[in-house]
């Protein structure tokens, strides 16, 4: 099947989806309606571009006909030639765009994510920066219309974050935030620095797709579940009922502790969401490490300790080291305006994949 046949098949399916989504039987089946809605949304950009491309092809045909029919009318012929030139340039642009839109999609792109942020090298300052990153992602999620839920958090005594685990839910969350995994470095003068010297600290970010139970089954025999009394806030319930849950995946020794909720069942459900994502991610990383050539052709899928981005406060500068992107917009980026960074990373990744296909 050539590219044009692929595009026509996508458009045909899109039109079929439109009819299905108007069918009362489908509308009454919530799960099917949601699945078909997601499928329609995932192909909308491709179909829109393909329809515009067909208009451009028609413009080329019309311009060529106009040149033939000019009958010595120099002005008309000149105008038609310019229209033909413009249309051919548009055709090339759309062909490149459509090739990218037809690239195989990451099966996780439409999923919600588990987001983990930790203060790393730099003590209190690293943990304060981890708090800044948490706020940045919260504000970005709000701008995208996503739901942001902090599931577990450990704070230090100066307003920083030792570790935070959050669930981010909404449309195409993973597709936009999957490139955030790695080490984020900050260069700034800490509030505790009396000499005005710039310090360098690091926080780490891990983004994992949410894995449903039906997608990844963990053998209950591989889990150890401990129930204990929660500590900290929670009122009288803390002392009377053991509601905190610790789950250990024995083969990998991956642990999750959850005590934010007031009931044992809710803590257990949240802990299982996190451990399922972590275990699936653990084995996915092993599989990916065995595909070195493929990993090197993409971004954001290498060493989790790799420094991916630097935030330089004195110069109001953010640099993404993977793609050489530098923006003098640190203040707006930390305020949650991440679109320019995310769009650049997505475009780079798509371009790299396209080059791989063309080899």
From Swiss-Prot:
Keywords: Cytoplasm, Methylation, Protein biosynthesis. Methylated by PrmC. Methylation increases the termination efficiency of RF1. InterPro entries: PCRF (IPR005139), Pep_chain_release_fac_I (IPR000352), Pep_chain_release_fac_I_sf (IPR045853), Prokaryotic/Mito_RF (IPR050057), RF-1 (IPR004373). It comes from Streptococcus sanguinis (strain SK36). It holds the Pfam family PCRF. This is Peptide chain release factor 1. The modification N5-methylglutamine is found at residue 236. Belongs to the prokaryotic/mitochondrial release factor family. It is found in: Cytoplasm.
């Amino acid at each position: 099947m050539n590219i044009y046949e692929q595009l026509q098949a996508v458009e045909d399916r899109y039109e079929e989806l439109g009819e299905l989504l108007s069918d009362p039987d489908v509308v009454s089946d919530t799960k099917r309606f949601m699945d078909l809605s997601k499928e329609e949304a995932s192909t909308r950009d491709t179909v829109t571009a393909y329809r515009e491309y067909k208009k451009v092809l028609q413009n080329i045909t019309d311009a060529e006909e106009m040149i033939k029919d000019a009958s010595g009318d120099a002005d008309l012929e000149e105008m038609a030639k310019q229209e033909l030139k413009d249309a051919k340039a548009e055709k090339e642009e759309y062909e490149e765009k459509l090739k990218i839109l037809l690239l195989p999609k990451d099966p996780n792109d439409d999923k919600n994510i588990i987001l983990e942020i930790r203060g790393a090298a730099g003590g209190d300052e690293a943990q304060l920066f981890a708090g800044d990153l948490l706020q940045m992602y919260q504000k970005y999620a709000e701008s995208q219309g996503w739901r942001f839920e902090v599931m577990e958090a450990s704070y230090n005594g100066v307003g920083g974050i030792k570790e935070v685990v959050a669930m981010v839910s909404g449309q195409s969350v993973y597709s936009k935030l999957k490139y955030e995994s790695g080490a984020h470095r900050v260069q700034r003068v800490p509030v505790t620095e009396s000499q005005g010297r710039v310090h360098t600290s690091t926080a780490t970010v891990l983004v994992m797709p949410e894995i449903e139970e039906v997608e990844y089954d963990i053998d209950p025999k591989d889990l150890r579940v401990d129930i204990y009394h929660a500590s900290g806030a929670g009122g009288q319930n803390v002392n009377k009922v053991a509601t905190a849950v610790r789950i250990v995946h024995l083969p990998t020794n991956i642990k999750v502790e959850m005590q934010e909720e007031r009931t044992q069942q809710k803590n257990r459900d949240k802990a299982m969401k996190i451990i399922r994502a972590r275990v699936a991610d653990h084995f996915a990383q092993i599989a990916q490490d065995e595909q070195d050539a493929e990993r090197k052709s993409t971004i954001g899928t290498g060493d989790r300790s790799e420094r991916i981005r630097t935030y330089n406060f004195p110069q109001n500068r953010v640099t993404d080291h993977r793609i050489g992107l530098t923006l003098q917009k640190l203040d707006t980026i930390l305020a949650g305006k991440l679109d320019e960074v995310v769009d650049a990373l997505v475009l780079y990744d798509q371009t790299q994949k396209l080059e791989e296909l063309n080899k």
